[in-house]
């Protein structure tokens, strides 16, 4: 039922658009309304009337001719979708040709129904208006027509031939994105990112790269980036037994490790000098110096 109403609303909007482009005279509208009223009052005689008109070559062609003109590309049809009528009862009216615009398009008459199934009556509706089928697929009306904006019915997307597609199953057809569609798309994208991350993938398909720093080289962990300055360093050892302080002073090569205790190390790089200025003038390098009180320790 919703698809039928959507189709009727679409056809009604096309009729209104055609009327805005080429208004029809009041005489033609009156004659067409009288003809449709006669057919709707006697639905059982519609087929017989059509056969008589086809044999005699006369009938309702005059109002349709004055309204829209040529039907050479395809004869107009009466489409009654309400009050028990169906597309099987659709009949073709013979209309003389005039001002043919396209050989592959036809002229159709449409009823307009409200949501309760009642036919909408009045000159401003599309009950008695004949419009050319095969109009452009753009269903947007010009100059701010509010009917298309306030309609709750999804009329579908136009196909390549210019007709609205309304029968594609039970799934609704939308002309644009809904908020739920955007949320679903974002959620799916996040889920895909998490899935790839859990597998240890570096996101090659999504254009994202996860840069991880390389692990440190164990062979270079204990070495310094800058070379060690060659030479000697001065070391002092203090030992206090409660009454006296034992002090030792000496020099060790810069390349040797610093350790606890009075240790005179050797050069490991082979480039440190054997003695330095302090070593050369220090008389207590190999002699232990005794100090009885802490204030006696020289600066």
Swiss-Prot record:
An annotated GO BP: symbiont-mediated suppression of host JAK-STAT cascade via inhibition of STAT2 activity
One GO cellular component, as annotated: host cell cytoplasm
Gene Ontology molecular-function annotations: metal ion binding
Biased amino acid composition, Acidic residues: 144-160
Keyword RNA-binding tagged: no
UniProt keywords, alphabetically: Host cytoplasm, Host-virus interaction, Inhibition of host innate immune response by virus, Inhibition of host interferon signaling pathway by virus, Inhibition of host IRF7 by virus, Inhibition of host MDA5 by virus, Inhibition of host RLR pathway by virus, Inhibition of host STAT2 by virus, Interferon antiviral system evasion, Metal-binding, Viral immunoevasion, Zinc
Protein residues bound to Zn(2+) 2: 255, 267, 269, 272
Function: Plays an essential role in the inhibition of host immune response. Prevents the establishment of cellular antiviral state by blocking interferon-alpha/beta (IFN-alpha/beta) production and signaling pathway. Interacts with host IFIH1/MDA5 and DHX58/LGP2 to inhibit the transduction pathway involved in the activation of IFN-beta promoter, thus protecting the virus against cell antiviral state. Blocks the type I interferon signaling pathway by interacting with host TYK2 and thereby inhibiting downstream STAT1 and STAT2 phosphorylation.
Quaternary organization: Interacts with host IFIH1/MDA5 and DHX58/LGP2; these interactions are involved in the inhibition of the host type I interferon signaling pathway. Interacts with host TYK2; this interaction inhibits the type I interferon signaling pathway without affecting the type II pathway. Interacts with host IRF7; this interaction inhibits IRF7 translocation to the nucleus. Interacts with host CHUK. Interacts with host RELA/p65; this interaction inhibits the nuclear translocation of NF-KappaB.
Protein name (database record): Non-structural protein V
UniProt source species: Measles virus (strain Yamagata-1)
Gene of this entry: P/V
């Amino acid at each position: 039922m919703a698809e039928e109403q959507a189709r009727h609303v679409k056809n009604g909007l096309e009729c209104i658009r055609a009327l805005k482009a080429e208004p029809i005279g009041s005489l033609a509208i009156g004659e067409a309304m009288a003809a449709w009223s006669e057919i709707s009052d006697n639905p059982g005689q519609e087929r017989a009337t059509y056969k008589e008109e086809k044999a005699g070559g006369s009938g309702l062609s005059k109002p349709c001719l004055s309204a829209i003109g040529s039907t050479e590309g395809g004869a107009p049809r009466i489409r009654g979708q309400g009050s028990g009528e169906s597309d099987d009862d659709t009949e073709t009216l013979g209309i003389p040709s005039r001002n043919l615009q396209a050989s592959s398009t036809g002229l159709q008459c449409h009823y307009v129904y409200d949501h309760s199934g009642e036919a909408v009556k009045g000159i401003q509706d599309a009950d008695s208006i004949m419009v050319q089928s095969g109009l452009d697929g753009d269903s947007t009306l010009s100059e701010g027509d509010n009917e298309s904006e306030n309609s709750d019915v999804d009329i579908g997307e136009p196909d390549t031939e210019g007709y609205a597609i309304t029968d594609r199953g039970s799934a609704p057809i939308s002309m644009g994105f809904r908020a739920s569609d955007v949320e679903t798309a974002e959620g799916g994208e996040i889920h895909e990112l998490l899935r790839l991350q859990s597998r240890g993938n570096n996101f090659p398909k999504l254009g994202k790269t996860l840069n991880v720093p390389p692990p440190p080289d164990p062979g270079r962990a204990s070495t310094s980036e800058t070379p060690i300055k060659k030479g000697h360093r001065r070391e002092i050892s203090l030992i206090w037994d409660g009454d006296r302080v034992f002090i030792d002073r000496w020099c060790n090569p810069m390349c040797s490790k610093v350790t606890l205790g009075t240790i005179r190390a050797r050069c490991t790089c082979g480039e440190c000098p054997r003695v330095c200025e302090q070593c050369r003038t220090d008389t207590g390098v190999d002699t232990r110096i005794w100090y009885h009180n802490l204030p006696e320790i020289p600066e």
